[in-house]
């Protein structure tokens, strides 16, 4: 497996960096945080991303997209982490597209994928029902009623739920035959359908998630996404895709936190010398650098595995998420330590990276969850 970027992938990484240097970053995030009317992301920034074609990258050409590689999109997510950009790109442009592409419901593919490519719709995917990620706990029910269905249940920590035009909800549905266990299904519902209530939550990194309550929401059979493999398999692959892209974001966070810390070590003086000359700090910095370099290879391996549809993708995804979560945690924690008390102030950027790292680590399972998942998938 080639773990080096090709020319196109390098170009998209550089272009994403150049764009986000000018249009995102801690100062922009601070302004977003202080705006009482904020949606948790910048509509202006999202509009510029649409103009650059980012939401269309993974969309097949037949639906107006560019059909680009996961590793190419992964370079953008890495830069998103570097510059703390907030947008619906992960959920709509990556996970929504990935799920619809794998579906055999041609109606929904033809209806939604072109809208995503054009930046004309936003989606949210409602999975978790507990405060910590546990996709095995699904109590939301899709129950047959009068020739249709009704959807009832509660979903927590729904990213982009506050701005979504539609939700893809993971729910339990009765088995096709009597006494068969319930199966899981993916249901598309409009955010304006009757019976849906949305409560928004502010995260420590200034982004937002939502709690969704579904009360007798009417659903037709057409709204249930169909697949050519089991829904459980589709869900696990979707979560693996999410965690690989979060690994790319966490790597970007770690890289920038390390860069900020090195800049501080080279400028802060104590006892008449730059603190970067202290051997103890040099050793800690060297360890961080080595870990980040390892993280780069891990993320490239995971993204390549997505493109090549590796049979071990679930295990690879969990290994990547577990490792990059620890790398980002160490990079931001060490960054705060090496900055000293001033690192905790709002004036310095390192605290923003610490907060983003904490949130991204927890989304779709923290490092402990993914160590367990990787071990289980390895036969332990």
Indicate residue ranges for each PLM-predicted region:
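Alpha-helical interface subdomain recognition
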Residues: 1-84, 103-107, 115, 119, ...
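N-terminal glycine-rich flavin-associated loop
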Residues: 85-107
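A generic local secondary-structure boundary/capping motif
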Residues: 112-114, 130-131, 139-141, 155-159, ...
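A short, Trp-centered hydrophobic/proline-enriched beta-strand micro-motif
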Residues: 119-130
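Cytochrome P450 C-terminal beta-domain/meander region
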Residues: 134-152
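Flexible, small-/acidic-enriched active-site or ligand-binding loops
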Residues: 137-143, 157, 190-226
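A short core secondary-structure module
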Residues: 152-196
